[in-house]
Amino acid sequence: MTGAPARAAASPGADEEAASQARLTAEFEALLAEGETVEPRDWMPDGYRRMLIRQIAQHAHSEIIGMQPEGAWLSRAPSLHRKSVLLAKVQDEAGHGLYLYSAAETLGVDRAELLAALHRGQQRYAATFNHPALTWADTGAVAWLTDGAAVINQAPLCHTSYGPYARAMRRVCQEEAFHVRQGYDLMKALCEGTPAQKAMAQDAVDRWWLPAVALMFGPPDTEAAGGDAKTAALGAAVSRRAIAWGIKRHTNDELRQRFVDHCVPQAERLGLTLPDPGIRWNEERGHYDFGPVDWELYRGALGDDTHTARQRLAHRVAAHEDGAWVREAAAAYAARQSGADTAGTSTEAVA
């Protein structure tokens, strides 16, 4: 009995399909090389689509979950003015999530699927928001530091290669920049207040600085930036592919450096001390040096299995379930309107 051939001959159809895929991929790469924008109806590699869905979904989830730390202080704001400013900010974050879910839907995925995956713990959000907001000063630190990191991280996305994402980010970044100014203004007011108020501001910075530096920019791209070999290899691989496709414009470590360079002078003007003894100006590099991040510590302290993380997700699921009647009513209204429009069109056609 003779053995079966090790590999069956490729069918002509398979060869044609492979050639077609190669041609489309080459055209796609050429489009990106020319700096053109990819639109929903354009052909794109499956890997590009998957990476975009993953990134946009995580971004949208982070906006929605990120409402919680500050939202908890709405009923305890010290004045009507501060309450109205914080309320507007929290509403903006909800709007950002909606813009981004809409951008994700242009890639052929439904936002209900994305939210269901989040609620099941199958998709992630920025672990920074697993950090508890313990005092009123935390609302200022979150806006100044976390939103400040978001602006630096997201501003290049206004020129990302996928059109709907880039257009959504232009609106998001304009509003996030305002949030940063609002947070800095609150920190300035506290620092110019009583000694107790300034101490509260310093305490908030002590707790929010490293989560912003560590978690808002993703894993390090090199071991020199503080990552172990496995973490650095993962960060570098993801960054290389995302940059090659024009989804990202800069590495995680480049963005992290920009954030530190931006915040150190601001902290000095406020009279606050950033909790990193390694921060010092490096004349040769033209940047501030800063200490390594203990990634294992932050994985444990702000991971998915902490009490605050479970609380954040449970609150999100409860809010989603409580709002089911609103979604059902909106869907029913849209269906009726669609039926009325169809009936009107049919009548006009008969006439």
Predicted regions, residues:
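Alpha-helical scaffold segments that form or flank carboxylate-/histidine-based iron centers
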Residues: 48-59, 77-96, 139, 164-176
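Conserved alpha-helical segments that form or flank metal/cofactor-binding pockets of metalloenzymes
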Residues: 13-25, 89-117, 183-187
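Helix-loop segments that flank and shape redox-cofactor active sites
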Residues: 42-48, 66-88, 149-165
